[in-house]
Amino acid sequence: WLLDQEGGWIPIRSRHHRRYKAAMRIPRRIQPLVDDGLVDEVIRPLMSGKEADVFAVRCGSEIRCAKVYKEAGKRAFKKAAQYQEGRKVRNSRRARAMEKGSRFGRDQQEDVWQSTELNALYKLINADVRVPQPYGCFDGVLLMELILDGEGHVAPRLSDVSLSPEQAREDHAVMMRYVTRMLCAGLVHGDLSEFNVLVDEHGPVIIDLPQVITAAANNNAARFFARDVKKITAYYGLYAPELLTTRYDGEIWSLFEAGELHPESDLSGVYQEDTHLADVDSLLDELEAVEIEELERLESLREEAREG
């Protein structure tokens, strides 16, 4: 049995499969995997995103997912440098080349971008976060598990699923547990939303991690974490409005900063803003105003000296 255009299954020997198979050309980037025996057949495209195209493929007797990363010039992912800050490159020669922006350095940067998702998937599986099982990344093609729903169809994205208030609350709690475990593993998704979560019979599955952020080494981590939590909460809040008043983003991050966050930390969704931070901002504004006033005073004195 193979996937049809709508995500269902059709017999492998049916006339519908023969017609679709004849029309499906093997993408250029997947051809080497076919030549090496890693992929036996490309069944159909599943989706096209801002950083990759995804295909259903057959590997022996298993149907898997092949994510073909787009080249840097064709990716529509904005402000990639903000996400990549803090990613470590062990080889010093590679690191220097990447800093200089040479052709070799750009190639190495691509390798790092493409391997980041693979490494994150393995790390998150070990952290008990539900993500697709990876099988390896080969020349910019990530082979991984194809997530299916309870009826054997390709699992829908969260954005395509309607939820009862009870289910929304339950799944939101699961997602807050997942982002907590991710943060305990040192990672922030960086682009989490209803479009990057699949839903199978067991609940949410997080996908799309090439932009994943190293929490302790990236100056943007807190901002991206807050955005992730707020966006996913806003979606579940469409079905359970009481979730919209929660502040899991601040609660979880404050525990993380204090070194008190654990994978199974008790969470309440209640967080009180630290007003001291606002006072510091006000003080900085005042200091800047004083500095500007002093510069203007000195310039005025210089003007008087020139005129005198």
Per-segment meaning from a language model:
Residues 1-48, 60, 166, 170, ...:
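Regulatory N- and C-terminal appendages and interdomain linkers associated
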Residues 2, 7-13, 18-154, 180, ...:
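Conserved ATP-binding subdomain of kinase catalytic cores across diverse folds
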Residues 60-71, 154-161, 165, 193-238:
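Catalytic activation segment of kinase domains across protein kinase-like and atypical kinase folds
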Residues 107-110, 161-168:
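Short, surface-exposed loop/turn motifs that are enriched in glycine and acidic residues
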Residues 140, 196-199, 248-255:
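A glycine-rich phosphate-binding loop feature that marks nucleotide/adenosyl-phosphate handling sites
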Residues 184-194:
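Catalytic-loop of the protein kinase fold
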